[in-house]
Amino acid sequence: MSIAIGAFTLATALSISACSSGASDGQITVAGSTTCLPIAEVAAEAYTEQTGLSVLVSGLGSSAGIEAVSNGTAEIATSSRGLNEEEQKLGLITIPVAHDGIAVIVNPDNPVQNLSTEQLRDIYAGKITNWSEVGGEDLAIQLVNRDEASGTREAFKSIIMDGEPFDRRAAVLSGTGQVRDVVSRTRGAIGYISMGFVESRYAETQVRAINVNHVEPIEATVASGGYPISRDLYFFTKGEPADEAQGYIDYVLSEEMDEQIREAGFIPAGNGSEAGEE
């Protein structure tokens, strides 16, 4: 079940040890989830045009972003999961930004159209290892997972795995784009990514989202709570943010950003019911 992966890192985008806290020199630092990048980057560009303030956005993973905000090396953390028990003790302010569904993706040549949550759990636990066991062709399942810093992994684990450990033979990748790319190029692969990244305008290859429990991962089913793998996306700050950072947050939550959030494949936080579990 091994898949060859080209290693790379986003850490150069934000040197955690080198950053100073605060919006000094007219710069706001935002770090965290790769899922949240489309929202954070579009808002950063528009906010910079309006205010002249520079907004540095980096996708290092939800856990890295939360750590950066808690130790003062970033002003805003973006996260595709809620705070865990230990993080809840850090004095962070939680700001829901959007609702999101986690899409289960396969290669376009894979004929499987639907998996139950139980089948997904057994696949990611290594109990189901061939697509023929779930109505597909006789082909080994190539598991693609996210790294432990990923908020998407934490949400998937919480909703799907029900205490079962992940199969250690899975390819473990550090970013949404990597997962999408590997699945698009590997006939037997399965992965999971934010619903908004399934049809990426930047990708050169395609993946296909399958139904889960016979429910399609679309905005309407996420908003209604019918799609089973749903979660919220968050910003976190360490206490009350500085005026410049608060202005950026207010812009992200404004009606002006709603259309951009929808175009990115998410549901603005002010629309629909809360999605899934943290």
Where in this protein do the model-derived segments appear?
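Sec-dependent bacterial lipoprotein signal peptides
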Residues: 1-17
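Exported/periplasmic ABC-transporter solute-binding proteins
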Residues: 19-278
